[in-house]
Regions:
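Cytochrome P450 proximal C-terminal region
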Residues: 2-28, 54, 303-308, 400, ...
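Conserved cytochrome P450 K-helix/beta-meander segment immediately N-terminal to the heme-binding cysteine loop
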Residues: 363-392
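Conserved cytochrome P450 K-helix E-x-x-R motif and the immediately C-terminal K′/meander segment
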Residues: 66-86, 221-232, 253, 309-352, ...
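Cytochrome P450 heme-thiolate monooxygenase catalytic core
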Residues: 6, 121-130, 145, 163-281, ...
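Cytochrome P450 substrate-recognition site 1
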Residues: 47-162, 175-176, 180-182, 198-210, ...
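Cytochrome P450 catalytic-core helices
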Residues: 276-295, 299-301, 414-431
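Cytochrome P450
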Residues: 2-32, 92-99, 161-185, 193-200, ...
Length: 472
């Protein structure tokens, strides 16, 4: 009897709780159901649930792989690791995890297929300050500002309408001087003939000093120099003088840009035209001077197409071997060995591996272009590889070697670089026979700066091929 009473009391208490328990239970079940459905949809949509993590290069506690990156050229260490850990792996640099891509296929997947998930740049505080909070087009995130800046550069400065016999010649010094003049004319509308007074520094700088500050060894005073150059050209424009330049275009069309943004836009145009094109041209001329047979093939092609006419941009589409020389030089001697770091702002996948949001991604261009699965004898300079493979010989494909990136973040200046470099190489070979001085054949190293310049500038012996000179 007592047991029955106790049971009834328990049931009465439970009935009293029913109005409260049922909603709570239903709510919990609903939340559980929604969580399950959300997870199921996410897994089906993204396909990441069962993906393995990226292979990890073993390191030490706390510092990770920092001690293994003692070499001044980390891209070579990245390439060695790829032989052991595969085309995609991760390393730790202190508290940060970095995924390194060493395969063209995986790199293009990141740049093109997964662009929407991996389109941001990850810049240090120092670089953000240097670039006026990511105002540099090449370094900015893929946002409205980047698209606007890229549009201005492509429309004006980078478009198709832009503009002793036995003594070794210092090619780099000679060519850098001419390229710097070209970049100044494009960006500002006028070359620097003598010197410029820089008000903020309180001194007058020569053309060579300005080149060093802006291009070859970027120093703290670059902003002051750019301000003086822009002020001088702005005064010319204000006086009514017609100046057809990138600066003139920005002042007229880009009304939303700040003074600082205009400054860095113009500086970027000068830097890229005067530096990266120099790197590719110098390496190409080194390889041609080293191999007389390949140089002879290029000269014969130019002679057959151009005859006695000087090579121009209009001839380039008829010169497949010259295009092959250009692309092979980019492959073996990419102006940048590692691209600016990317940042995965949402979960994604690469190469069949799970990439969580927040991961930093490094594209090892050097490693991609040394991948033996992609390139036969990658250590050799062989322009003919771009003629034998139909997929690689398309002269309109600037992204086969990843030197210009790929996808929506591809280099805006790829067409300009091709026109300048190919025309320059063609004219130099058309006018002169090139050879290296005795002992110059084996020097084949590069520096570890922003761009991969030759460790020692190219010195070559030039022999005129024709009666007229290069400057005629």
């Amino acid at each position: 009897m007592g047991s029955t009473i106790e049971l009834n009391n328990i049931l009465d208490e439970f009935e009293a709780l029913v109005p409260f328990v049922i909603p709570v239970a239903l709510g919990a079940l609903s939340l559980l159901f929604l969580y399950f459905i959300k997870g199921l949809i996410f897994a089906q949509k993204k396909g990441y649930a069962k993906l393995p993590p990226v292979p990890v290069v073993p390191g030490l506690p706390l510092i990770g792989n920092l001690l293994q990156l003692k070499e001044r050229k980390p891209y070579k260490t990245f390439t060695k690791w790829a032989q052991t850990y595969g085309p995609i792996y991760s390393i730790r640099t202190g508290a940060f995890t970095l995924v390194v891509l060493n395969s063209t296929d995986v790199a293009k997947e990141a740049l093109v297929t997964r662009h929407s998930s991996i389109s941001s740049r990850k810049l240090s505080t120092a670089l953000k300050i240097l670039t006026f909070d990511n105002a540099l087009v090449a370094a900015s995130d893929d946002n409205d500002f980047h698209k606007m800046g890229r549009r201005h550069m492509v429309t004006n400065i980078l478009g198709t309408n832009a503009q002793s016999p036995q003594e070794a010649v210092n090619f780099k010094k000679m060519f850098a001087y001419e390229l710097f003049g070209l970049s100044l004319k494009q960006a500002l509308g006028q070359n620097i003939e003598d010197s410029v007074y820089v008000e903020e520094l309180g001194t007058t700088l020569s053309r060579d000093e300005i080149f060093k500050i802006l291009v070859s060894d970027v120093l703290d005073g670059w902003k002051a120099v750019m301000n003086s150059l822009i002020k001088e050209q702005t005064n010319r424009i204000a006086s009514g003088e017609e100046v057809n330049s990138f600066l003139d275009y920005l002042l007229c069309e880009a009304k939303t840009l700040t003074t600082e943004q205009i400054t860095i836009f113009v500086w970027e145009a000068i830097l890229e035209a005067a530096d990266t094109t120099l790197v590719t041209t110098e390496w190409a001329m080194y390889e041609l001077a080293k191999d007389q047979n390949l140089q002879g093939l290029l000269y014969e092609e130019i002679k057959n197409v151009c005859g006695s006419d000087k090579i121009t941009e209009e001839h380039l589409s008829q010169l497949p071997y010259l295009n092959a020389v250009f692309h092979e030089s980019l492959r073996k001697h990419s102006p940048a060995s590692v691209a600016l770091l990317r940042y995965a702002h949402e979960d994604t996948q690469l190469g069949g591996y799970y990439i969580p949001a927040g991961t930093e991604i490094a594209l090892n261009i050097y490693g991609c272009n040394r991948d033996k699965n992609e390139w036969e004898s990658p250590e050799e300079w062989k322009p003919e590889r771009f003629l034998l493979d139909k997929e690689k010989c398309d002269p309109t494909d600037f992204y086969k070697t990843l030197a210009f990136g790929a996808g929506k973040r591809a280099c805006a200046g790829s067409l300009q670089a091709m026109l300048i470099v190919c025309t320059s190489i063609g004219r130099l070979v058309q006018e002169f026979e090139w050879r290296l001085p005795r002992g110059g054949e084996e020097e084949n190293d590069d520096t570890a700066t922003f761009t991969t310049h030759k460790l020692h500038p190219l010195h070559a012996i030039l022999k005129p091929r024709n009666h007229y000179s290069l400057v005629s």
